[in-house]
Amino acid sequence: MNEKFKIGVIGLGYVGFPLACLFAKKYQVIGYDINEKRIKEINAGIDSTNEVKAGALEAALANGMVCTSQLDDIKPCNVYIVAIPTPVDDFYNPELLPLKSASTSVGKVLKKGDYVIYESTVYPGVTEEVCAPIL
């Protein structure tokens, strides 16, 4: 297990959850989501979305991956991967509120020297113009 990086995956949906399981093969991973029901299922070894192959969740948990809905639990991380959906409105404009909210959460636990990676479908400039100032 590589102990140089402790990875926090923010958002355990169809992108973040498989990503967390994959990184858990080599790194310490803490998954964070605001959906407490989802957290309980994952920590119990249940993938109700069928996003990962059979055995992948069990392997990730066995390697020490933990998931939480408590923001303070991700403070020990030094790499944060924000995998939040970006829905669009009726006019196909991106709704950035979930991304802004996730950025605010990460900003509360971010330390000097930490890394933040955004894995969301957004238009060019959003990370620099919207997310970075929030962090």
List the predicted regions and their residue ranges.
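Short conserved AdoMet
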Residues: 24, 75, 110-111
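Rossmann-like NAD(P)(H) cofactor-binding subdomain of soluble oxidoreductases
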Residues: 88-135
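A structured beta-alpha segment of the ubiquitous adenosine-cofactor-binding alpha/beta core
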Residues: 54-78, 88, 107
